């Protein structure tokens, strides 16, 4: 399964070469993605999957939101893909204030897509809203959010990605533009112009998980995290890379995604109700230990093998750790 960033695709009927040609919009491209994904299966049993990312301000967002539902026709639906709608604080504020959201074709608003998720986005967005020379349309923020939530509830496969928070809390100095299939990994990416392009960047998920349900003591995490980090780091060097843009960035960043499973089992073993405040405190405690031991293992590995090639491109190189952007006020807001 893969993540696809389609947010740069022009909106339907956008002018090309000064109006000489009009763009066909996102749906024909999504049809192509869908066909490509479906031709890849594991022994004919498990098919390929993809999640496609779009900004909430995209010109075709209203049509994008309904692409998975069982209404419409095969011509205007792309049901075999999943979708991630990217939102930032500005749009939540407009929802709260019952204001409008202005929709753009990315090509008509230069730099807007590149700024999305970064501090400079808001000023640029407001500037383009006032520019009468740029094609645009508006929709009520509450109407659009309700449509998003309705389709999310009915299809179960439309995700919400808070793109500004992904960058604020990211470990990277490079911008995060998208996520992966399941939305748990956020790594920097750059478009490739051809299959041998060495300037682009394709992010790979190097993943494993620790089963918390089997723990008898939280201190056992130290050895488990160390083993996980070392095993995955070996895989990075061992595996083959058919695409240069994936090989270069993976070897240079050496990003690992190590999570935990069996959380409900772990809470039950500790006689904690899943929805209680005590559960939130326990999850915070085990997550903090988990993160600490993973960082410790990574540091020990760097002492043995030297730091990764692109270490200076991370916030770690400036002494900024995940806990430094963590908001304590959110910890005890669970019901």
Regions found by a protein language model. Give the residues of each.
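Aromatic-lined, polymer-binding surfaces characteristic
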Residues: 253-260
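Conserved, charged catalytic cores of large soluble enzymes
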Residues: 18-32, 42-48, 53-172, 260-323
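Function-dense linear segments that define catalytic or interfacial modules
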Residues: 1-18, 26-29, 39-43, 151-250, ...
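Conserved small/polar residues in nucleotide/adenosyl-binding loops
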Residues: 332-335
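Structured beta-strand/loop patches that form or line metal/cofactor-binding pockets in enzymes
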Residues: 328-330
